[in-house]
């Protein structure tokens, strides 16, 4: 039987989910998770408490509760439920107050709320990533923080969007297709922005599997074509001295972090 887990917050619950998942992923146990955001009133907190208690009665095990609740009166209600409680905010707030010599000023939604310049930067970056996805236009490449290159289905779009949503980075991406392979070279506009270029590559077998799910038994998805494209693109990266990373078996979070590590790009979100 899987262990029940609750992620609870008086905001989006993203912080509780991220921290909780990072901890639980270390254990070879199956977890059944429920996320409950915007628990902003004592009435909502009482309803969540009842839900937790029902879970305990049903399973015979106290569920794990990861939360990032700012208001003390709401936290106290969750504390009083039949749960194993992990309070991320309070775990760090008191020691930091001692070190900084300043009392915390609790504000709901501060972590993932609308925060002036940071929020606007993220929205601008997301819009930019969508408008400059898959080589739709090269008119605004000069405004990019980074331009991701690669063959079709190697992870360019999700990586671009993650960089924009998570870090406020303006990421364009440009695909190399079958027709490019006979004489593969960078378009002039990309050559002029070579310092912004970053390549993605992928294992040909994995690329074949991904393309098969999209266009089964086509030339585009054939293992032979995948091998040709990956080989040609990697040779071009090396020839042009473009840094690149292999996306095979890596999550979009890992890919984005590797890109930031290699390029030294500044995060705009925090």
Swiss-Prot record:
It catalyses: [pyruvate, water dikinase] + ADP = [pyruvate, water dikinase]-phosphate + AMP + H(+); [pyruvate, water dikinase]-phosphate + phosphate + H(+) = [pyruvate, water dikinase] + diphosphate. It is an enzyme of class 2 (transferase). The keyword Protein transport does not apply. ADP binds at residues 150-157. It holds the Pfam family Kinase-PPPase. Its EC number is 2.7.11.33, 2.7.4.28. Keywords: Kinase, Nucleotide-binding, Serine/threonine-protein kinase, Transferase. The keyword Lipid metabolism does not apply. GO terms for molecular function: ADP binding; ATP binding; phosphotransferase activity, phosphate group as acceptor; protein serine/threonine kinase activity. It comes from the Bacteria. InterPro entries: Kinase-pyrophosphorylase, PSRP. NCBIfam families: PRK05339.1. Belongs to the pyruvate, phosphate/water dikinase regulatory protein family. PSRP subfamily. Bifunctional serine/threonine kinase and phosphorylase involved in the regulation of the phosphoenolpyruvate synthase (PEPS) by catalyzing its phosphorylation/dephosphorylation. This is Putative phosphoenolpyruvate synthase regulatory protein. It comes from Shewanella loihica (strain ATCC BAA-1088 / PV-4).
């Amino acid at each position: 039987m899987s262990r029940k887990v609750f992620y609870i917050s008086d905001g989006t619950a993203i912080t509780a989910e991220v921290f909780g998942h990072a901890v639980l992923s270390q254990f070879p146990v199956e977890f059944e998770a429920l996320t409950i955001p915007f628990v902003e009133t004592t009435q909502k907190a009482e309803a969540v408490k009842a839900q937790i208690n029902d879970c305990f009665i049903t399973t015979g095990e106290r569920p794990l509760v990861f939360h990032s609740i700012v208001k003390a009166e709401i936290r106290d209600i969750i504390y009083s439920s039949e749960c194993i409680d992990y309070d991320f905010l309070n775990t760090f707030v008191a020691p930091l107050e001692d070190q900084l010599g300043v009392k915390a000023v609790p504000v709901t939604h501060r972590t993932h709320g609308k925060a002036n310049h940071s929020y606007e930067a993220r929205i601008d970056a997301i819009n930019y990533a969508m408008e400059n996805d898959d080589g739709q236009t090269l008119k605004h490449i000069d405004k990019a923080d980074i331009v991701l290159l690669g063959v079709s289905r190697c992870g360019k779009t999700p990586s671009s969007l993650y960089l924009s949503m998570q870090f406020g980075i303006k990421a364009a991406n440009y695909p190399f297709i079958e027709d490019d392979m006979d004489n593969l070279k960078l378009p002039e506009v990309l050559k002029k922005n070579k310092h912004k270029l970053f390549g993605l590559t992928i294992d040909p077998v994995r690329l074949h599997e991904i393309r098969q799910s999209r266009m089964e038994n086509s030339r585009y998805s054939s293992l032979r074509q995948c091998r040709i494209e990956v080989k040609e693109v990697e040779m071009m990266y090396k020839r042009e001295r473009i840094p690149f990373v292999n996306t095979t078996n890596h999550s979009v979070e890992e890919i984005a972090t590797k890109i930031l590590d290699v390029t030294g790009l500044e995060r705009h979100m925090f």
